[in-house]
Swiss-Prot record:
Organism this protein belongs to: Salmonella paratyphi B (strain ATCC BAA-1250 / SPB7)
Family label: Belongs to the tRNA nucleotidyltransferase/poly(A) polymerase family. Bacterial CCA-adding enzyme type 1 subfamily.
UniProt xrefs under InterPro entries: CCA_bact, HD/PDEase_dom, HD_domain, NT_sf, PolA_pol_head_dom, PolyA_RNA-bd, tRNA_CCA-adding_enzyme
Record-listed E.C. numbers: 2.7.7.72, 3.1.3.-, 3.1.4.-
Recorded superkingdom: Bacteria
Function: Catalyzes the addition and repair of the essential 3'-terminal CCA sequence in tRNAs without using a nucleic acid template. Adds these three nucleotides in the order of C, C, and A to the tRNA nucleotide-73, using CTP and ATP as substrates and producing inorganic pyrophosphate. tRNA 3'-terminal CCA addition is required both for tRNA processing and repair. Also involved in tRNA surveillance by mediating tandem CCA addition to generate a CCACCA at the 3' terminus of unstable tRNAs. While stable tRNAs receive only 3'-terminal CCA, unstable tRNAs are marked with CCACCA and rapidly degraded.
Gene: cca
Name of the featured protein: Multifunctional CCA protein
SUPFAM superfamilies: Nucleotidyltransferase (SSF81301), Poly A polymerase C-terminal region-like (SSF81891)
GO biological process: RNA repair; tRNA 3'-terminal CCA addition
Amino acid sequence: MKIYLVGGAVRDALLGLPVKDKDWVVVGATPQEMLDAGYQQVGRDFPVFLHPQTHEEYALARTERKSGSGYTGFTCYAAPDVTLEADLQRRDLTINALARDDDGQIIDPYHGRRDLEARLLRHVSPAFGEDPLRVLRVARFAARYAHLSFRIADETLALMREMTAAGELEHLTQERVWKETENALTTRNPQVYFQVLRDCGALRVLFPEIDALFGVPAPAKWHPEIDTGVHTLMTLSMAAMLSPQLDVRFATLCHDLGKGLTPKNLWPRHHGHGPAGVKLVEQLCQRLRVPNDLRDLAKLVAEYHDLIHTFPILQPKTIVKLFDAIDAWRKPQRVEQIALTSEADVRGRTGFEASDYPQGRWLREAWQVAQAVPTKEVVEAGFKGIEIREELTKRRIAAVASWKEKRCPNPAN
Protein backbone atom coordinates (compact mmCIF):
# COMPACT_ATOMS: atom_id res chain seq x y z
CA MET A 1 0.00 0.00 0.00
CA LYS A 2 1.32 3.43 -1.01
CA ILE A 3 -0.28 6.76 -0.18
CA TYR A 4 0.08 9.98 -2.18
CA LEU A 5 -1.11 13.54 -1.70
CA VAL A 6 -2.84 14.53 -4.96
CA GLY A 7 -4.56 17.31 -6.85
CA GLY A 8 -5.25 20.78 -5.54
CA ALA A 9 -3.09 20.54 -2.43
CA VAL A 10 0.00 19.74 -4.52
CA ARG A 11 -0.90 22.38 -7.11
CA ASP A 12 -1.43 25.19 -4.61
CA ALA A 13 1.70 24.30 -2.63
CA LEU A 14 3.76 24.58 -5.82
CA LEU A 15 2.12 27.95 -6.53
CA GLY A 16 2.95 29.16 -3.03
CA LEU A 17 -0.73 29.45 -2.15
CA PRO A 18 -2.37 28.34 1.12
CA VAL A 19 -3.39 24.68 1.04
CA LYS A 20 -6.96 24.23 2.27
CA ASP A 21 -8.22 20.71 1.60
CA LYS A 22 -5.98 17.68 1.25
CA ASP A 23 -6.96 14.69 -0.89
CA TRP A 24 -5.06 11.42 -0.85
CA VAL A 25 -4.87 8.46 -3.22
CA VAL A 26 -4.09 4.97 -1.96
CA VAL A 27 -2.43 2.58 -4.43
CA GLY A 28 -2.31 -1.19 -3.92
CA ALA A 29 -4.98 -1.53 -1.23
CA THR A 30 -8.41 -3.15 -0.97
CA PRO A 31 -11.46 -1.70 0.83
CA GLN A 32 -11.10 -4.36 3.54
CA GLU A 33 -7.47 -3.39 4.18
CA MET A 34 -8.58 0.23 4.63
CA LEU A 35 -11.33 -0.77 7.06
CA ASP A 36 -8.90 -2.98 8.99
CA ALA A 37 -6.57 0.03 9.32
CA GLY A 38 -9.36 2.02 10.98
CA TYR A 39 -10.54 4.10 8.03
CA GLN A 40 -14.26 4.82 7.67
CA GLN A 41 -15.82 4.22 4.24
CA VAL A 42 -18.00 7.10 2.95
CA GLY A 43 -18.03 6.70 -0.84
CA ARG A 44 -20.97 4.87 -2.42
CA ASP A 45 -20.01 5.04 -6.10
CA PHE A 46 -16.31 4.39 -5.50
CA PRO A 47 -14.18 3.59 -2.44
CA VAL A 48 -13.46 6.75 -0.45
CA PHE A 49 -12.44 6.60 3.20
CA LEU A 50 -11.98 9.06 6.05
CA HIS A 51 -8.74 8.94 8.02
CA PRO A 52 -9.43 7.94 11.65
CA GLN A 53 -7.58 10.97 13.07
CA THR A 54 -7.52 13.75 10.46
CA HIS A 55 -10.83 12.86 8.75
CA GLU A 56 -9.21 13.76 5.42
CA GLU A 57 -10.38 11.84 2.36
CA TYR A 58 -8.40 8.85 1.13
CA ALA A 59 -9.58 7.32 -2.15
CA LEU A 60 -8.46 4.05 -3.64
CA ALA A 61 -6.75 4.57 -6.99
CA ARG A 62 -9.35 4.17 -9.73
CA THR A 63 -10.04 4.57 -13.42
CA GLU A 64 -13.25 5.79 -15.04
CA ARG A 65 -14.92 4.70 -18.25
CA LYS A 66 -17.71 6.57 -20.02
CA SER A 67 -20.89 4.48 -19.85
CA GLY A 68 -23.68 7.00 -20.35
CA SER A 69 -24.49 10.64 -21.06
CA GLY A 70 -23.64 13.67 -18.98
CA TYR A 71 -21.29 14.08 -16.04
CA THR A 72 -22.70 11.12 -14.06
CA GLY A 73 -22.45 8.53 -16.84
CA PHE A 74 -19.22 6.86 -15.70
CA THR A 75 -18.26 3.39 -14.54
CA CYS A 76 -15.45 3.32 -11.98
CA TYR A 77 -12.89 0.57 -11.52
CA ALA A 78 -10.97 0.55 -8.24
CA ALA A 79 -8.57 -2.29 -7.47
CA PRO A 80 -5.05 -2.83 -6.13
CA ASP A 81 -3.69 -3.09 -9.69
CA VAL A 82 -4.70 0.47 -10.65
CA THR A 83 -1.52 2.56 -10.84
CA LEU A 84 -1.04 6.13 -9.67
CA GLU A 85 -0.47 7.24 -13.28
CA ALA A 86 -3.77 5.66 -14.35
CA ASP A 87 -5.59 7.42 -11.51
CA LEU A 88 -4.05 10.79 -12.38
CA GLN A 89 -4.94 10.37 -16.06
CA ARG A 90 -8.68 10.60 -15.33
CA ARG A 91 -8.30 14.11 -13.88
CA ASP A 92 -9.37 17.22 -15.73
CA LEU A 93 -6.29 19.47 -15.97
CA THR A 94 -2.59 18.71 -15.96
CA ILE A 95 -2.08 21.07 -13.02
CA ASN A 96 -4.51 18.90 -11.04
CA ALA A 97 -2.84 15.63 -12.11
CA LEU A 98 0.08 16.02 -9.71
CA ALA A 99 0.99 13.82 -6.75
CA ARG A 100 3.50 13.93 -3.89
CA ASP A 101 4.88 10.91 -2.07
CA ASP A 102 5.97 10.51 1.56
CA ASP A 103 9.46 11.78 0.73
CA GLY A 104 8.14 15.00 -0.81
CA GLN A 105 8.91 13.88 -4.37
CA ILE A 106 6.52 15.19 -7.03
CA ILE A 107 5.07 12.63 -9.44
CA ASP A 108 4.12 14.43 -12.64
CA PRO A 109 3.37 12.07 -15.55
CA TYR A 110 1.34 14.65 -17.52
CA HIS A 111 3.65 17.68 -17.27
CA GLY A 112 1.54 19.63 -14.80
CA ARG A 113 4.56 21.48 -13.39
CA ARG A 114 5.50 22.70 -16.83
CA ASP A 115 1.97 24.05 -17.31
CA LEU A 116 2.03 25.62 -13.84
CA GLU A 117 5.17 27.51 -14.78
CA ALA A 118 3.69 28.47 -18.16
CA ARG A 119 0.44 29.51 -16.42
CA LEU A 120 -1.60 27.19 -18.66
CA LEU A 121 -4.86 25.37 -17.99
CA ARG A 122 -4.56 22.30 -20.22
CA HIS A 123 -6.64 19.11 -20.26
CA VAL A 124 -4.91 15.83 -19.42
CA SER A 125 -6.43 13.63 -22.12
CA PRO A 126 -9.26 13.48 -24.68
CA ALA A 127 -11.39 11.93 -21.91
CA PHE A 128 -11.90 15.54 -20.74
CA GLY A 129 -14.59 15.76 -23.43
CA GLU A 130 -16.66 13.05 -21.74
CA ASP A 131 -17.59 15.21 -18.74
CA PRO A 132 -19.50 18.45 -19.53
CA LEU A 133 -19.07 19.73 -15.97
CA ARG A 134 -15.40 20.24 -16.79
CA VAL A 135 -16.29 23.15 -19.08
CA LEU A 136 -17.55 25.03 -16.02
CA ARG A 137 -14.67 23.83 -13.84
CA VAL A 138 -12.08 25.16 -16.27
CA ALA A 139 -13.93 28.49 -16.47
CA ARG A 140 -13.89 28.61 -12.67
CA PHE A 141 -10.18 27.79 -12.50
CA ALA A 142 -9.55 30.55 -15.06
CA ALA A 143 -11.34 32.99 -12.73
CA ARG A 144 -9.62 31.64 -9.62
CA TYR A 145 -6.12 32.00 -11.04
CA ALA A 146 -6.59 35.01 -13.33
CA HIS A 147 -4.59 37.18 -10.91
CA LEU A 148 -1.64 34.84 -11.54
CA SER A 149 -2.01 35.31 -15.33
CA PHE A 150 -3.26 31.80 -16.05
CA ARG A 151 -4.94 31.24 -19.41
CA ILE A 152 -6.65 28.30 -21.08
CA ALA A 153 -4.59 26.33 -23.61
CA ASP A 154 -5.88 26.81 -27.16
CA GLU A 155 -6.54 23.10 -27.64
CA THR A 156 -8.49 22.93 -24.37
CA LEU A 157 -10.66 25.90 -25.31
CA ALA A 158 -11.24 24.29 -28.72
CA LEU A 159 -12.38 21.08 -27.01
CA MET A 160 -14.70 23.08 -24.73
CA ARG A 161 -16.25 24.65 -27.84
CA GLU A 162 -16.73 21.22 -29.39
CA MET A 163 -18.41 19.91 -26.24
CA THR A 164 -20.75 22.90 -26.14
CA ALA A 165 -21.61 22.63 -29.84
CA ALA A 166 -22.34 18.91 -29.42
CA GLY A 167 -24.99 19.71 -26.79
CA GLU A 168 -23.06 18.07 -23.93
CA LEU A 169 -23.87 20.90 -21.51
CA GLU A 170 -27.57 20.15 -21.78
CA HIS A 171 -26.95 17.06 -19.62
CA LEU A 172 -25.88 19.20 -16.64
CA THR A 173 -28.34 19.59 -13.78
CA GLN A 174 -29.17 23.17 -12.86
CA GLU A 175 -27.96 22.53 -9.31
CA ARG A 176 -24.47 21.69 -10.59
CA VAL A 177 -24.45 24.73 -12.86
CA TRP A 178 -25.34 26.95 -9.93
CA LYS A 179 -22.80 25.30 -7.59
CA GLU A 180 -19.93 25.96 -10.02
CA THR A 181 -21.24 29.48 -10.66
CA GLU A 182 -21.55 30.21 -6.95
CA ASN A 183 -17.94 29.11 -6.42
CA ALA A 184 -16.79 31.19 -9.39
CA LEU A 185 -18.58 34.28 -8.07
CA THR A 186 -16.51 34.12 -4.88
CA THR A 187 -13.16 34.21 -6.74
CA ARG A 188 -11.04 37.32 -7.13
CA ASN A 189 -12.03 37.75 -10.79
CA PRO A 190 -15.54 36.30 -11.25
CA GLN A 191 -16.00 38.11 -14.56
CA VAL A 192 -13.41 35.79 -16.12
CA TYR A 193 -15.72 32.81 -15.53
CA PHE A 194 -18.48 34.35 -17.62
CA GLN A 195 -16.05 35.55 -20.29
CA VAL A 196 -14.68 32.02 -20.69
CA LEU A 197 -18.20 30.61 -20.93
CA ARG A 198 -18.91 33.15 -23.65
CA ASP A 199 -15.67 32.31 -25.47
CA CYS A 200 -16.66 28.65 -25.74
CA GLY A 201 -20.35 29.25 -26.50
CA ALA A 202 -21.57 28.00 -23.12
CA LEU A 203 -22.93 31.35 -21.93
CA ARG A 204 -25.66 31.21 -24.58
CA VAL A 205 -26.64 27.73 -23.38
CA LEU A 206 -26.49 28.23 -19.61
CA PHE A 207 -27.07 31.98 -19.15
CA PRO A 208 -29.05 33.20 -22.19
CA GLU A 209 -30.22 36.28 -20.26
CA ILE A 210 -26.60 37.42 -19.82
CA ASP A 211 -25.47 36.35 -23.28
CA ALA A 212 -28.26 38.47 -24.81
CA LEU A 213 -26.60 41.63 -23.44
CA PHE A 214 -23.56 41.33 -25.70
CA GLY A 215 -24.00 43.46 -28.79
CA VAL A 216 -26.67 45.63 -27.15
CA PRO A 217 -25.44 49.26 -27.21
CA ALA A 218 -25.87 51.90 -24.53
CA PRO A 219 -25.37 55.67 -25.03
CA ALA A 220 -21.65 56.38 -25.46
CA LYS A 221 -21.98 59.52 -23.31
CA TRP A 222 -22.76 57.40 -20.25
CA HIS A 223 -21.15 54.15 -21.37
CA PRO A 224 -17.89 54.65 -23.28
CA GLU A 225 -17.58 50.85 -23.43
CA ILE A 226 -20.96 50.94 -25.30
CA ASP A 227 -21.61 47.16 -25.22
CA THR A 228 -23.95 46.21 -22.36
CA GLY A 229 -22.42 42.74 -22.02
CA VAL A 230 -18.96 44.25 -21.63
CA HIS A 231 -20.36 46.71 -19.08
CA THR A 232 -21.96 43.85 -17.13
CA LEU A 233 -18.64 42.04 -16.77
CA MET A 234 -16.90 45.32 -15.86
CA THR A 235 -19.45 45.94 -13.09
CA LEU A 236 -18.99 42.39 -11.80
CA SER A 237 -15.23 42.94 -11.69
CA MET A 238 -15.78 46.17 -9.77
CA ALA A 239 -18.25 44.51 -7.38
CA ALA A 240 -15.61 41.88 -6.60
CA MET A 241 -13.20 44.67 -5.63
CA LEU A 242 -15.81 46.39 -3.47
CA SER A 243 -17.26 43.39 -1.64
CA PRO A 244 -16.58 39.71 -0.93
CA GLN A 245 -20.32 39.08 -0.57
CA LEU A 246 -21.89 36.59 -2.96
CA ASP A 247 -25.21 38.50 -2.76
CA VAL A 248 -23.64 41.76 -3.94
CA ARG A 249 -21.74 40.12 -6.78
CA PHE A 250 -24.71 38.12 -8.07
CA ALA A 251 -27.05 41.13 -7.89
CA THR A 252 -24.51 43.22 -9.80
CA LEU A 253 -24.28 40.53 -12.49
CA CYS A 254 -28.05 40.71 -12.97
CA HIS A 255 -28.58 44.48 -12.67
CA ASP A 256 -28.97 45.27 -16.39
CA LEU A 257 -30.72 42.14 -17.68
CA GLY A 258 -33.67 44.29 -18.75
CA LYS A 259 -31.57 45.94 -21.46
CA GLY A 260 -31.68 42.65 -23.34
CA LEU A 261 -35.42 43.20 -23.83
CA THR A 262 -35.17 46.67 -25.41
CA PRO A 263 -36.44 46.64 -29.04
CA LYS A 264 -33.63 47.45 -31.48
CA ASN A 265 -35.45 50.49 -32.84
CA LEU A 266 -35.14 52.11 -29.38
CA TRP A 267 -31.39 51.49 -29.02
CA PRO A 268 -29.17 52.83 -27.49
CA ARG A 269 -31.68 54.06 -24.90
CA HIS A 270 -33.21 51.62 -22.43
CA HIS A 271 -35.97 53.50 -20.64
CA GLY A 272 -37.56 51.34 -17.95
CA HIS A 273 -34.97 48.58 -18.25
CA GLY A 274 -34.75 48.22 -14.46
CA PRO A 275 -38.31 47.09 -13.73
CA ALA A 276 -38.32 45.18 -17.04
CA GLY A 277 -35.32 43.17 -15.88
CA VAL A 278 -37.01 41.92 -12.71
CA LYS A 279 -38.87 39.13 -14.53
CA LEU A 280 -35.63 38.01 -16.22
CA VAL A 281 -33.89 37.86 -12.84
CA GLU A 282 -36.79 35.78 -11.56
CA GLN A 283 -36.57 33.50 -14.59
CA LEU A 284 -32.81 32.96 -14.26
CA CYS A 285 -33.03 32.33 -10.51
CA GLN A 286 -35.92 29.91 -10.82
CA ARG A 287 -34.12 27.91 -13.50
CA LEU A 288 -30.83 27.69 -11.59
CA ARG A 289 -32.54 27.34 -8.19
CA VAL A 290 -30.65 30.30 -6.81
CA PRO A 291 -31.24 30.80 -3.06
CA ASN A 292 -34.14 33.12 -2.26
CA ASP A 293 -32.08 35.77 -0.46
CA LEU A 294 -29.80 36.18 -3.48
CA ARG A 295 -32.78 36.26 -5.83
CA ASP A 296 -34.63 38.88 -3.80
CA LEU A 297 -31.65 41.24 -3.62
CA ALA A 298 -30.96 40.82 -7.35
CA LYS A 299 -34.57 41.74 -8.17
CA LEU A 300 -34.40 44.85 -5.99
CA VAL A 301 -31.09 45.93 -7.52
CA ALA A 302 -32.45 45.45 -11.04
CA GLU A 303 -35.48 47.58 -10.21
CA TYR A 304 -33.89 50.39 -8.20
CA HIS A 305 -30.23 50.81 -9.21
CA ASP A 306 -30.96 53.72 -11.56
CA LEU A 307 -33.00 55.44 -8.86
CA ILE A 308 -29.98 55.49 -6.54
CA HIS A 309 -27.93 57.25 -9.23
CA THR A 310 -30.43 60.15 -9.15
CA PHE A 311 -30.24 60.51 -5.35
CA PRO A 312 -29.66 64.31 -5.29
CA ILE A 313 -33.00 64.98 -7.01
CA LEU A 314 -35.03 62.44 -5.05
CA GLN A 315 -37.75 63.78 -2.78
CA PRO A 316 -37.47 62.79 0.90
CA LYS A 317 -40.78 60.96 0.52
CA THR A 318 -39.33 58.89 -2.33
CA ILE A 319 -36.26 58.00 -0.27
CA VAL A 320 -38.37 56.71 2.61
CA LYS A 321 -40.58 54.80 0.15
CA LEU A 322 -37.41 53.22 -1.22
CA PHE A 323 -36.49 52.00 2.27
CA ASP A 324 -40.00 50.54 2.53
CA ALA A 325 -39.70 48.87 -0.88
CA ILE A 326 -36.42 47.13 -0.06
CA ASP A 327 -37.73 46.13 3.39
CA ALA A 328 -34.81 47.91 5.02
CA TRP A 329 -36.50 48.09 8.43
CA ARG A 330 -36.34 44.29 8.72
CA LYS A 331 -33.29 43.72 6.48
CA PRO A 332 -31.02 46.73 7.06
CA GLN A 333 -28.07 45.01 5.33
CA ARG A 334 -29.82 45.67 2.01
CA VAL A 335 -29.02 49.38 2.21
CA GLU A 336 -25.29 48.66 2.17
CA GLN A 337 -25.68 45.95 -0.47
CA ILE A 338 -27.64 48.22 -2.81
CA ALA A 339 -25.19 51.08 -2.25
CA LEU A 340 -22.34 48.78 -3.30
CA THR A 341 -24.09 47.39 -6.38
CA SER A 342 -24.99 50.89 -7.53
CA GLU A 343 -21.39 52.02 -7.05
CA ALA A 344 -20.17 49.01 -9.05
CA ASP A 345 -22.59 49.98 -11.83
CA VAL A 346 -21.19 53.52 -12.07
CA ARG A 347 -17.53 52.56 -11.73
CA GLY A 348 -17.85 49.56 -14.04
CA ARG A 349 -17.47 51.77 -17.11
CA THR A 350 -14.47 52.59 -19.26
CA GLY A 351 -12.72 55.62 -17.76
CA PHE A 352 -14.89 55.71 -14.62
CA GLU A 353 -13.14 52.99 -12.63
CA ALA A 354 -11.71 55.43 -10.06
CA SER A 355 -14.81 57.64 -9.84
CA ASP A 356 -16.23 58.77 -6.54
CA TYR A 357 -19.81 57.69 -5.87
CA PRO A 358 -21.33 60.10 -3.34
CA GLN A 359 -24.82 58.67 -3.94
CA GLY A 360 -23.78 55.57 -2.00
CA ARG A 361 -22.69 57.66 0.99
CA TRP A 362 -25.90 59.70 0.86
CA LEU A 363 -28.03 56.56 0.75
CA ARG A 364 -26.26 55.20 3.84
CA GLU A 365 -26.56 58.54 5.68
CA ALA A 366 -30.25 58.92 4.82
CA TRP A 367 -30.84 55.43 6.15
CA GLN A 368 -29.12 56.23 9.45
CA VAL A 369 -31.31 59.33 9.79
CA ALA A 370 -34.55 57.51 8.93
CA GLN A 371 -33.97 54.55 11.21
CA ALA A 372 -33.00 56.82 14.11
CA VAL A 373 -36.60 58.10 14.33
CA PRO A 374 -37.86 56.40 17.52
CA THR A 375 -41.01 54.27 17.24
CA LYS A 376 -41.42 54.45 21.01
CA GLU A 377 -42.13 58.21 20.91
CA VAL A 378 -44.89 57.70 18.33
CA VAL A 379 -46.57 55.08 20.51
CA GLU A 380 -46.20 57.23 23.63
CA ALA A 381 -47.81 60.13 21.76
CA GLY A 382 -51.03 58.10 21.67
CA PHE A 383 -51.08 56.85 18.09
CA LYS A 384 -52.64 53.42 17.63
CA GLY A 385 -52.86 50.71 14.98
CA ILE A 386 -52.25 51.88 11.43
CA GLU A 387 -51.80 55.45 12.71
CA ILE A 388 -48.45 54.41 14.21
CA ARG A 389 -47.07 53.44 10.81
CA GLU A 390 -48.44 56.59 9.15
CA GLU A 391 -47.02 58.91 11.80
CA LEU A 392 -43.69 57.08 11.82
CA THR A 393 -43.46 57.51 8.05
CA LYS A 394 -44.23 61.24 8.36
CA ARG A 395 -41.52 61.71 10.96
CA ARG A 396 -39.01 59.74 8.91
CA ILE A 397 -39.75 61.87 5.84
CA ALA A 398 -39.33 65.04 7.91
CA ALA A 399 -36.03 63.80 9.35
CA VAL A 400 -34.69 62.86 5.90
CA ALA A 401 -35.85 66.22 4.50
CA SER A 402 -33.98 68.11 7.20
CA TRP A 403 -30.84 66.03 6.63
CA LYS A 404 -31.04 66.29 2.85
CA GLU A 405 -31.30 70.06 2.85
CA LYS A 406 -27.98 70.26 4.67
CA ARG A 407 -26.04 67.31 3.19
CA CYS A 408 -27.51 66.63 -0.24
CA PRO A 409 -29.62 69.53 -1.52
CA ASN A 410 -31.58 69.12 -4.75
CA PRO A 411 -29.50 70.90 -7.46
CA ALA A 412 -32.73 72.01 -9.14
CA ASN A 413 -33.81 74.07 -6.12
